[in-house]
Design a protein with these regions (language model features):
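Short His-centered aromatic/hydrophobic patch
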Residues: 105
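Catalytic donor-sugar/metal-binding loop of nucleotide-sugar-dependent glycosyltransferases
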Residues: 100, 109-127
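C-terminal, non-catalytic tails of nucleotide-sugar-dependent glycosyltransferases
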Residues: 147-159
């Protein structure tokens, strides 16, 4: 994902919109995000109701708890796959992340909140998966999570 963000920046994009391709988000909600683009540098989705199961919601709560403990930021949804960001804001933080960093959106949300950028969270609908195969299972989530804690601590020291 980092390479795609860099591609957009390199090619002069003013805004970067990111969403997943598995049909869980609603394209009709984009207009509300677009209307907020002049007021905020990033409009980030917030999934208070999730159609992807309790285990995924639990993982998101753990992530938000870790971000609060490690970075001192309180966000309602760190990794929502529906976000409209000014390319200049992404460019400001992207080089802080390793090229192969697995969860860049979580760190972008963290940086934006930590440095008090002009951001807002907007409720989005989040349906059960409509297509594709769930590539994340509990053992993989634990492995990613364990690595993330180490990565978060390292990135915090660099702030």
């Amino acid at each position: 994902m980092i390479a795609l963000y860099k591609y957009a920046i390199k090619n002069g994009a003013d805004y970067i919109f990111q969403t997943d391709s598995d049909g869980q988000t609603n394209p009709e909600e984009f207009a509300a995000f677009w209307q907020l683009r002049d007021k905020y540098d990033a409009v980030l989705g917030h999934r208070s109701v999730r159609g992807d199961g309790k285990s995924r919601a639990f993982v998101e709560h753990v992530v938000c708890f870790l971000l609060r403990c490690i970075f001192g930021v309180k966000v309602p949804d760190a990794n929502a796959p529906y976000r409209l960001m000014k390319a200049s804001l992404v460019d400001k933080y992207i080089d802080r992340l390793p090229e192969d960093f697995n969860i860049p959106n979580i760190m972008f949300t963290t940086y934006f909140a930590y440095y008090q950028e002009r951001i807002t969270f907007r409720e989005i609908s989040f349906k059960p998966r409509q297509g594709g195969v769930n590539s994340i299972n509990i053992p993989r989530i634990i492995k990613i999570g364990w690595k993330a804690v180490g990565d978060f601590r390292k990135l915090k020291r660099e702030m």
